[in-house]
C-alpha cells in the first residue's frame, strides 16, 4: 500500500507538475489523477509517483437521454483505454444521474443497460473500476453505490471482479451507514481507499 492524495484546490492553481514535485518532496508515494493523459503519466513517472486512481470524464452515463448516454459511454471507454496506455490501473467513478431528482429505480434500470458494456471494456483493458460511495447532494442523495442495498444490486447486475469500490468511510458515516459492517461484507470488492476526517 502506498500513501497519496487526491488533488486539492491548490494543485489546480499551481499545475500538476509542481503539485507532483511537492508530493515527492514531502514523502508521498502516489497520487490520484484527473482523466489520465500521456503528460500526466510522464510527470508521475518523473517524480516516482504511483498512479493511484484516475477519474473518468463525467458526461451523464445515467442520463435518460440515450444520445447523452452514448456519448458518455464512448468517452468512458476512451478514459479506460488511456489509463491502460499511460500506466494506471484503477478508474475512479461516481455513479450519479445528471438530474439529482431522478429516481434510484430509473438510475438502476439505466445502469443495468450501460454498465455491463463499461465493465466489459475494462476487463479487456485489465483495468479496475472503483465506485466512489459519495451519496450526492441533499435532499435526494441520488447516487448509486452509497448503501449496502445499492452495492448488492450493482454487483448482482455486474458480478465482474473488475468492478469494485473505493472504500471511503466518511461517505458512509455521513448517511449513518455502519462502515465497518459494510467493509466486512464488501471487503473483497475494495479496489482503492480514501480517508478523511468526518463526524
Language model feature labels by segment:
Residues 1-89, 112, 116, 123, ...:
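N-terminal pre-domain/capping segments
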Residues 6-10, 34-36, 56-59, 96-98, ...:
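Active-site beta-loop-alpha junctions enriched in small/polar residues
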Residues 15, 174-177:
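A short, acidic/glycine-rich surface segment
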Residues 39-40, 178-182:
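Short acidic active-site motifs
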Residues 66-165, 174-175, 185:
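Active-site acidic/histidine proton-transfer and metal-coordination neighborhood
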Residues 160, 171, 192-194:
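Histidine-centered active-site/metal-ligand motif
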Residues 180-199:
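Aromatic-lined glycan-binding groove of carbohydrate-active enzymes
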Amino acid at each position: 500500500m502506498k500513501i497519496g492524495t487526491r488533488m486539492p484546490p491548490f494543485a489546480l492553481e499551481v499545475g500538476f507538475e509542481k503539485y507532483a514535485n511537492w508530493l515527492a518532496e514531502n514523502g508521498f508515494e502516489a497520487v490520484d489523477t484527473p482523466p489520465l493523459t500521456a503528460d500526466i503519466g510522464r510527470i508521475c513517472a518523473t517524480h516516482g509517483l504511483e498512479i493511484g486512481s484516475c477519474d473518468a470524464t463525467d458526461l451523464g452515463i445515467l442520463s435518460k437521454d440515450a444520445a447523452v448516454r452514448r456519448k458518455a459511454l464512448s468517452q468512458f471507454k476512451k478514459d479506460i483505454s488511456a489509463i491502460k496506455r499511460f500506466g494506471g490501473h484503477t478508474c475512479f467513478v461516481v455513479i450519479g444521474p445528471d438530474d439529482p431528482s431522478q429516481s434510484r429505480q430509473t438510475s438502476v434500470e439505466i445502469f443495468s443497460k450501460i454498465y455491463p458494456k463499461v465493465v466489459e471494456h475494462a476487463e479487456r483493458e485489465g483495468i479496475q473500476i472503483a465506485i466512489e460511495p459519495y451519496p450526492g447532494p441533499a435532499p435526494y442523495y441520488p447516487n448509486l453505490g452509497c448503501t449496502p442495498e445499492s452495492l448488492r444490486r450493482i454487483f448482482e447486475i455486474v458480478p465482474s471482479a473488475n468492478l469494485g469500490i473505493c472504500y471511503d468511510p466518511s461517505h458512509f458515516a455521513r448517511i449513518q451507514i455502519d462502515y465497518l459492517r459494510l467493509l466486512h461484507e464488501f471487503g473483497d470488492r475494495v479496489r482503492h481507499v480514501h480517508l478523511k476526517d468526518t463526524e
